[in-house]
A protein has these predicted regions:
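Active-site-adjacent betaalpha module
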Residues: 1-7, 17, 46-53, 69, ...
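Glycine-rich N-terminal loop/short-helix segment of MobA-like nucleotidyltransferase
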Residues: 16-30
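A short acidic, glycine-rich active-site loop
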Residues: 27-39, 80-90
Length: 204
């Protein structure tokens, strides 16, 4: 029997995106979509947190006070620096309160300094050491960190699943476009319920 596992990667579930006073809360215009996907993700974590064939991993993005990790940033990374978002040890960089009840079940891999969860982290090494062959992506932002991490995982040889109801874009249109047109180029697009069905729990 295969011992390979699925890693549920939680991306961007930090106060600067989700808290009402978060610096980048306004970047997610589709608030209802964001709230729905958060509820779906919490339900999914509840379903898989005790399964031996699943790992739940968080990869928060954090920067030092002078953003020395960023060399002439552009795009969203420039916005992060200019607005002072995701500063290490700041309230905005912390994982949102909704996940606190799962603190013993979620492994946090630190070091992320860019859009890709594999960048500047030991994520790949950890996944291979723990026999992970499939990565399921949940979080924000669909067109940025989700897409970047998904492409990188695919290039590294992992099977990639993007969870359509556990991810959120800046707008509803962006979310739908990526799920319909972009993600299928390198990944499987599933709902959380479909993920559970395609990876049913196997009794010992």
């Amino acid at each position: 029997m295969s011992t390979n596992k699925t890693a549920l990667l939680l991306i961007g579930f930090q106060n600067d995106y989700f808290h009402k006073e978060g610096i980048l809360t306004g970047a997610l215009e589709d608030v209802s979509g964001r709230d729905r996907m958060l509820e779906n993700t919490l339900n999914l974590v509840e379903e898989v947190k005790d399964r031996e064939d699943f790992l739940v991993i968080s990869t928060p993005i954090q920067f030092t006070e002078n953003y020395s990790e960023l060399n002439e940033p552009t795009g969203i990374l420039k916005l992060i620096k200019d607005t002072g978002a995701f500063l290490k040890d700041s309230p905005g960089s912390q994982t949102i309160e909704e996940f606190s009840r799962f603190s013993d079940s979620i492994l946090e891999i630190k070091g992320k300094r860019g859009l890709n969860a594999f960048s500047n982290t030991n994520l790949e090494e950890f996944l291979r050491k723990n026999d992970v062959d499939r990565i399921a992506l949940a979080g924000v932002v669909t067109s940025v960190c989700i897409d970047s991490t998904g492409r990188s995982a695919h290039e590294k040889g992992f099977e990639v699943t993007v969870l359509s109801d556990c991810t959120a874009g800046r707008t509803e249109f962006e979310q739908q476009f990526y799920c319909d047109q972009i993600f299928p180029l390198y990944a499987t697009v599933e709902t959380r319920e479909e993920l559970i069905r395609t990876r049913p729990e196997v009794s010992a």
